[in-house]
Amino acid sequence: MCSLITQLCDAGQLADYVGLGWLNAVSSQPYLVQALGLQPPPRRVDVDAAFRDAKGLHGHQPWVATPLPGQTVRALFIGINYYGTSAALSGCCNDVKQMLATLQKKGLPINEAVILVDEDNFPGRTDQPTRDNIVRYMAWLVKDAKPGDVLFFHYSGHGTQCKSRGDSDEKYDQCIAPVDFQKSGCIVDDDIHKLLFSRLPEKVRLTAVFDCCHSGSIMDLPFTYVCSGGEQASGTPHMKRIREGNDVLGDVMMISGCADEQTSADVKNTATFGTGSTGAGGAATQCITCMLMNNQSLSYGKLLIETRDMLKRKGFKQVPQLSASKAIDLDQTFSLTEMFSVDRSIQ
């Protein structure tokens, strides 16, 4: 199956990500995430240079679907297994396959996709997930975005922390680790925020999924989901402002695999989640894709609660987080394309 899909991509045809996602990784080995530990603060990202580099970049159409009239749908997928290093993982590229399969199955009409993975022969792969490539393709994702456009971002790999470079709210910055992080350094949350949001206009919808350790606030968004009585309690859920000065014009929602202080677990056999996939993969990705595929009318609040409940039933201690650029009305039906209804009582 995998070799056939690779041949189709090489011939310029479209990949069947649904088939690949549902039958992938039958020979994958189980893996456990080894925490990277505190990393040295990396050099700052030159945001202006990143956008200059992004001008000539293009993605590819991964599948055919009914388009959204007058709207562009663009997506960036990053999966890193760190092959041949002391940081090696086994399921992050599978997570990308699973997410692609889910979005194809749901019919999201992506006009342009970029896939940065370190797995050889990955169908539709754009390039390696180096620090430079991740930075410039983050800029590519949002460049020239206009009101009504829809963007999607998925990262599966190592997440870690470094001492804060001056964020007044946090002692540590959260980071993602590119495939070459040992040589080139990580990418911190401050720079992720600047790359994705500093030039994002109003009425652009962006959904992000981070399946990595220490990812709770990795986009530095101003609002987060809270529940009275604790994260796993049954109290009244609502959005709460946790940051000042980081407001974002677009409608951005992020689901992260765990809180800032937690690690994000991985599963030996994703078939136990009932998503149709097999082999190694991220627990949060598997739960989120299962929720998206099996529940057509979940609210934003229910999407998070049921993802948390599914992980808890499977014996995982991590608590996925939901954060956003606005105080989302948590009773609104979840959508990858629609603008938010906002709870005006929360400032």
UniProtKB/Swiss-Prot annotation:
Auto-proteolytic cleavage of the propeptide after Lys-55 and between the large and small subunits after Lys-268 is required for catalytic activity towards large protein substrates but is dispensable towards small oligopeptide substrates. After processing, the propeptide and the large and small subunits remain associated by non-covalent bonds. In vivo, the unprocessed enzyme appears to be the predominant form. Changing C92A: Reduced autoprocessing and 50% loss of catalytic activity towards substrates. Optimum pH is 7.7. One of its GO terms (biological process) is proteolysis. One of its GO terms (molecular function) is metal ion binding. It is found in: Recycling endosome. Its main location: other. Keywords: Autocatalytic cleavage, Calcium, Endosome, Hydrolase, Metal-binding, Protease, Thiol protease, Zymogen. Cysteine protease that cleaves specifically after arginine or lysine residues. This is Metacaspase-2. The gene is MCA2.
